[in-house]
Amino acid sequence: VASLVGSEMCIRDSSKNLVSEMKNTFMEIKQGWPKTLPKNIIHGDLFIDNIFFHRGKFLGFIDFYFSSNDFEAYELATCINALCFNKKKKTFSYDKGKTLQLIKGYETIRKLQKKEKDCLNILCKGSALRYLATRSYDYINTPKSAIIKKKDPREYIQKLAFHKKINSFSSYIK
């Protein structure tokens, strides 16, 4: 059993080779990672705790620590991972309706290009692997005295497994 030992709990995955699986997934993502998609300044961390709404309307967002010049569609992929799964106890299930609404809203401002749609799956995998790796590292290495809240990385094992089953843009919305 692969274990990631943190200061407060031991994270155990039923996979016997989580680290090996992460390395293999990284190599797969690296090989398929797009070279030329539209780039712009992105937030890079649009999770619900960084987005503010008032009476159902977007108000603003905070925490620009991970802002960078990157693929615009990568921002969308991170939003899918952060906002389009429902949690019931310790299980995360994908919600096509949320993704469809997210993409529809996104496209009222900027239409996705065909090549961005074609790359959405690899971008979602890359985003999920990023959060699995960084949250695992933070969970293990953040001292108890730190001000930040450690976040459980295990949800990203489930999200990454979901993305591995998907092979097209339409699978995300239909």
Predicted features along the sequence, with ranges:
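Single conserved hydrophobic/aromatic residue that forms the stacking wall/gate
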Residues: 1-6, 10-11
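All-alpha amphipathic helical-bundle segments outside canonical DNA-binding/catalytic cores
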Residues: 114-124
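Active-site activation/catalytic loop segments of kinase-like enzymes and analogous catalytic loops
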Residues: 73-111, 127-143
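Hydrophobic core segments within long, regular secondary-structure runs in both alpha-
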Residues: 23, 99-103, 153, 157-160
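Active-site acidic catalytic loop and adjacent metal/ATP-binding pocket
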Residues: 27-74
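A structural signal for short hydrophobic/aromatic patches embedded in well-ordered alpha helices
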Residues: 19-22, 102, 119-120
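ATP/Mg2+ or Mg2+-diphosphate-binding catalytic cores
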Residues: 131-174
